[in-house]
Design a protein with these regions (language model features):
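Conserved donor-binding/catalytic core segment of Leloir-type glycosyltransferases
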Residues: 4, 220-236
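Acidic anion/phosphate-binding donor-loop and adjacent secondary structure
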Residues: 195, 209-226
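N-terminal subdomain of nucleotide-sugar transferases
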Residues: 1-54, 60-64
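Membrane-proximal helix-turn-helix segments that form the acceptor-binding/catalytic region
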Residues: 144-183, 191-192, 196
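Active-site proximal beta-strand in glycosyltransferases
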Residues: 2-6, 97, 115-155, 184, ...
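A short, charged, and often flexible helix/loop element on the N-terminal side
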Residues: 61-87, 100, 153-165
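Short N-terminal targeting/anchoring amphipathic segment
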Residues: 89-105, 111, 121
Length: 236
């Protein structure tokens, strides 16, 4: 069976081939790919990601095949040029299943618009179309403006602007969910919000894998750093 993943990160071995620094996020996805291959010898896995290049690049010298799509003008706005690349990938790899990881990026929508959706599934990693309305945490806009920094002004990236960007990505997300026929999620929250957008979609429950460290280490009181609160990394 041939499975094509659409990912928001470039996996470490592809980064090494491109002489790029591997990402510090999304390690669970790479761990999941390795576990999937180890438990399914008949599986051919390919991963499509955006990269800062100018042409479609194919890497075939690893157990996972990589398709690197030109980022062109970033990943925040929909770019119709992505459609031709996804079509080329589908024709070249001929996947039996297309698995899109994450619903919030416009290139996921490009894949859904272009490729066969009959055997396509999207994994929900959160829903920006819902998060956007809570992005400011109930803090009044005028109070946020008072706390603007030099960085916010120079980069034109204040919290209200970030919220606006999330609303836009949320619209891409809603379009995607109305196209696909299958969605993977983990919680009742996922399921309820997916069905609110697309009532006829088939919802599948599936927990995600974790990074290998979580499976090889065990918490013990006598070795822990006491009186410390551990927080996971946060992107937003």
């Amino acid at each position: 069976m041939k499975v094509l993943w659409v990912s928001n990160i470039i996996f470490p071995e592809a980064c090494n081939d491109l002489r790029m620094t591997p990402p510090v996020v999304g390690g669970w996805m790479h761990a999941g790919a390795i576990a999937l291959l180890e438990s399914n010898s008949h599986l051919d896995l390919a991963v499509a990601s955006l990269y800062p290049g100018t042409e479609l690049k194919i890497i075939t010298n690893h157990k996972i095949q990589y398709y690197l799509i030109p980022q062109i003008k970033g990943n925040q706005y929909y770019n119709k040029e992505w459609e031709q690349f996804f079509k080329q990938i589908e024709e070249h790899f001929k996947p039996d299943i297309i698995h899109i990881h994450g619903s919030e990026y416009p290139y996921s929508l490009a894949c859904a618009k272009t490729c066969n959706t009959k055997n396509m599934v999207v994994s929900i990693q959160g829903m920006v179309s819902v998060y956007a309305q809570y992005y400011l945490g109930g803090i009044p806009i005028k109070e946020i403006h008072k706390a603007r920094t030099f960085r916010d002004i120079i980069r034109k990236d204040s919290l209200p602007i970030q919220q606006h960007k999330m609303y836009r990505r949320g619209e891409y997300e809603r379009q995607l969910l109305r196209i696909v026929k299958h969605v993977i999620g983990r919680t009742r929250w996922d399921r309820s919000n997916v069905w609110a957008v697309s009532p006829n979609v088939t919802y599948h429950f599936c927990n995600e894998t974790l990074r290998p460290t979580f499976y090889h280490k065990k918490w013990e009181y006598h070795t822990c750093q006491k009186h410390t609160i551990f927080l996971s990394q946060a992107h937003y």
